[in-house]
C-alpha cells in the first residue's frame, strides 16, 4: 500500500479547517430572591443598565439596579413561576419595540406584542424604547397648526406640530374626550394623499381599566380613525414595569414617523399613573424616596420622555412628534409634585375644571388658567384674525363677571360686554365626537365677535351655530373653500361672509 505524505497532509489540513467549536456561551445568574415583581439576581456581573434579561420560564425583565453583589431586575409580567435558585440569562439587548406603519390599526402591550387578536405584527424595524432626545441644532421652531377640532382649544390655546401641551384636570372632567376628539379630527387630512399633511396618532393607555381601553378602541374603529392610530395599552391589571414602560414604547413608535419626515401625535393617558408605577418600582428596589415618596429622578423620567416630542429641521426631513400628556389632579390641586413637574416641562397646559364641567360648559376648559406657550405661531392667519378679538372679549368678561355679582346697576357698555361674553362662552361649547374643520370654526367665531349672537337669547346660540354651519356648507361652500385654501380672511371673503351672515340672521330671527 502506497502512502503519500503530501496527500495525508492535505487531508489533515482540510479536516482542521472544517473543525469548528460549536459552543454557545451565555452569561447567566441565579435568582437570590423574588417578590412584588422584583427579582434580586447574583452573577450577572457584566449586565448593562436597562438590558433585557430572560428567566428560565421565558418571562422577561429589565435590569435597573446594578449593585456590588447583586442586580435588581423588574419583571415584565407575573413573578409567580419564578423561583429562588433559577437561572437568568442576559439577552445583550437594551429594551426595544417594533416600529413602522405596520402597527397602524393595532393594539399592542408595553413590549410591542399584539393584544388585539389580529395576528402577528409586520414591522419595519425595532427601536430602543429609551433614547436620547434630539438636541438644539436638529430642531426647528413650531409653526404648523395641529388642529384638535375644538373651538375652545384651536382659537384660544393653539397647539402646533412638535409642541408638548399638557391636558390637566380632575377625574371625570373630559381629559380623554379632548384627546379622542383630537385623534378623530385628523380623519379628513389622513384620508387625503398628501403624506406631508397626514398626522398619525399613538394613544398610550397607562393604568386604565381594560373596559375603558376597549371602549376607546371601539370608538376609534366606529369613527374610522383606528386605521391611522396605534394603541399601546398597559392596563391597571398589568405589572408596574409595564405601566412604566408603555409611554416610552409609544414614543419610540411615534419617533419612527418623526424621523422619516412624517408627522405624529402621541397621547399619554395618563402620566400620573406612570409616576405611581415608577414610585412602586423604585421603593421596591430600595431607592431612597423623596417628596410624596416619589424617587428623586421622577422629574427626569418625565422630562426625558417629553423632550422626545420635537419639530425637526428641514435637513432632517421636517418631521414632527406632538405630545399631549394627561395628568390627573386631586381636587383641582395643580401645585402637587407631579402636576408642577409636568407643567414646567411642557409648552403650555389645557386646564379642565370639574365646576365648569358640571355647569355644562364642555369641553370644560378654564380659559384663564390654560395657556399655550407657542401661541399664535401655531395658528393659520384666518384663525389669528378672529381669535385675537375673542380672547380679549372673554378676558374682559371674566373680569367684569366677578364684579357684576356685587351690583345690579351696571352701565350699558358693561352690560353689553357681559351679554357678549355669555354668548361667546356658549359658542365655545361643543359636543363630543363632533370636531369642526378650521374654516368652519373661523366662520362661527367671526359671527360671535361681530355681534351676530348679541340679539339672541343664550339658549338659542347652539341652534344658531348649527343652522349657520348648515347654510354655509350647502349655500356658500365657496366662502369656506376660500378660507381653507388661502388660510386667511381677505377683504373679499369678509364681505361675502358678512352678507351670508346678514341673510342667515334675518331668516333665523
From Swiss-Prot:
This is ATP synthase subunit alpha. It is an enzyme of class 7 (translocase). F-type ATPases have 2 components, CF(1) - the catalytic core - and CF(0) - the membrane proton channel. CF(1) has five subunits: alpha(3), beta(3), gamma(1), delta(1), epsilon(1). CF(0) has three main subunits: a(1), b(2) and c(9-12). The alpha and beta chains form an alternating ring which encloses part of the gamma chain. CF(1) is attached to CF(0) by a central stalk formed by the gamma and epsilon chains, while a peripheral stalk is formed by the delta and b chains. The keyword Transmembrane does not apply. GO terms for cellular component: plasma membrane; proton-transporting ATP synthase complex. The record marks 370 as: Required for activity. ATP binds at residues 169-176. Produces ATP from ADP in the presence of a proton gradient across the membrane. The alpha chain is a regulatory subunit. One of its GO terms (molecular function) is ATP binding. The gene is atpA. It is found in: Cell inner membrane. InterPro entries: ATP_synth_asu-like_sf (IPR023366), ATP_synth_asu_C (IPR000793), ATP_synth_asu_C_sf (IPR038376), ATP_synth_F1_a_nt-bd_dom (IPR033732), ATP_synth_F1_asu (IPR005294), ATPase_a/bsu_AS (IPR020003), ATPase_F1/V1/A1_a/bsu_N (IPR004100), ATPase_F1/V1/A1_a/bsu_N_sf (IPR036121). Pfam families: ATP-synt_ab, ATP-synt_ab_C, ATP-synt_ab_N. Belongs to the ATPase alpha/beta chains family. It is a peripheral membrane protein. Its main location: membrane.
Amino acid at each position: 500500500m502506497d502512502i503519500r505524505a503530501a496527500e495525508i497532509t492535505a487531508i489533515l489540513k482540510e479536516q482542521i479547517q472544517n473543525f469548528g467549536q460549536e459552543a454557545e456561551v451565555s452569561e447567566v445568574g441565579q435568582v437570590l430572591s423574588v417578590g412584588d415583581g422584583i427579582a434580586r439576581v447574583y452573577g450577572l456581573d457584566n449586565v448593562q443598565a436597562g438590558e433585557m434579561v430572560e428567566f428560565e420560564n421565558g418571562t422577561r425583565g429589565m435590569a435597573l439596579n446594578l449593585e456590588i453583589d447583586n442586580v435588581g431586575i423588574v419583571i415584565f409580567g407575573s413573578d409567580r413561576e419564578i423561583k429562588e435558585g433559577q437561572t437568568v440569562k442576559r439577552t445583550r439587548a437594551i429594551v426595544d419595540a417594533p416600529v413602522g406603519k405596520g402597527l397602524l390599526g393595532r393594539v399592542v402591550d408595553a413590549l410591542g406584542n399584539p393584544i388585539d387578536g389580529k395576528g402577528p405584527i409586520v414591522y419595519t424595524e425595532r427601536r430602543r424604547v429609551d433614547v436620547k432626545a434630539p438636541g438644539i441644532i436638529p430642531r426647528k421652531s413650531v409653526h404648523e397648526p395641529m388642529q384638535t377640532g375644538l373651538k375652545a382649544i384651536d382659537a384660544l390655546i393653539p397647539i402646533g406640530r412638535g409642541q408638548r401641551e399638557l391636558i390637566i384636570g380632575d377625574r371625570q372632567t373630559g381629559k380623554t374626550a379632548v384627546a379622542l376628539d383630537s385623534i378623530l379630527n385628523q380623519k379628513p387630512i389622513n384620508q387625503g394623499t398628501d403624506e406631508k399633511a397626514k398626522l398619525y396618532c399613538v394613544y398610550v393607555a397607562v393604568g386604565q381599566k381594560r373596559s375603558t381601553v376597549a371602549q376607546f378602541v371601539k370608538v376609534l374603529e366606529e369613527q374610522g380613525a383606528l386605521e391611522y392610530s396605534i394603541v399601546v395599552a398597559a392596563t391597571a391589571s398589568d405589572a408596574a414595569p409595564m405601566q412604566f414602560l408603555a409611554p416610552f414604547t409609544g414614543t419610540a413608535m411615534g419617533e419612527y414617523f418623526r424621523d422619516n419626515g412624517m408627522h405624529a401625535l402621541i397621547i399619554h393617558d395618563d402620566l400620573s399613573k406612570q409616576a405611581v408605577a415608577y414610585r412602586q418600582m423604585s421603593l421596591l428596589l430600595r431607592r431612597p424616596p423623596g417628596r410624596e415618596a416619589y424617587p428623586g429622578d421622577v422629574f427626569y423620567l418625565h422630562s426625558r420622555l417629553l423632550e422626545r416630542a420635537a419639530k425637526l429641521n428641514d435637513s432632517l426631513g421636517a418631521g414632527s412628534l406632538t405630545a399631549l400628556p394627561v395628568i390627573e389632579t386631586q381636587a383641582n390641586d395643580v401645585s402637587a409634585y407631579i402636576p408642577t413637574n409636568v407643567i414646567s416641562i411642557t409648552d403650555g397646559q389645557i386646564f379642565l375644571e370639574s365646576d365648569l364641567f358640571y355647569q355644562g360648559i364642555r369641553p370644560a376648559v378654564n380659559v384663564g388658567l390654560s395657556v399655550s406657550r407657542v401661541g399664535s405661531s401655531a395658528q393659520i392667519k384666518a384663525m389669528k384674525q378672529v381669535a385675537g378679538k375673542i380672547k380679549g372679549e372673554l378676558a374682559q368678561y371674566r373680569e367684569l363677571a366677578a364684579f357684576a355679582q356685587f351690583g345690579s346697576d351696571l352701565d350699558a357698555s358693561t352690560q353689553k360686554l357681559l351679554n357678549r361674553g355669555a354668548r361667546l362662552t356658549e359658542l365655545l361649547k361643543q359636543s363630543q365626537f363632533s370636531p369642526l374643520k378650521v374654516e368652519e370654526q373661523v366662520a362661527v367665531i367671526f359671527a360671535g365677535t361681530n355681534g351676530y349672537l348679541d340679539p339672541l337669547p343664550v339658549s338659542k346660540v347652539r341652534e344658531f351655530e348649527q343652522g349657520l354651519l348648515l347654510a354655509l356648507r350647502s349655500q356658500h361652500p365657496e366662502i369656506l373653500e376660500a378660507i381653507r385654501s388661502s388660510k386667511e380672511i381677505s377683504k373679499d371673503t369678509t364681505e361675502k361672509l358678512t352678507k351670508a351672515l346678514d341673510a342667515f340672521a334675518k331668516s333665523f330671527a
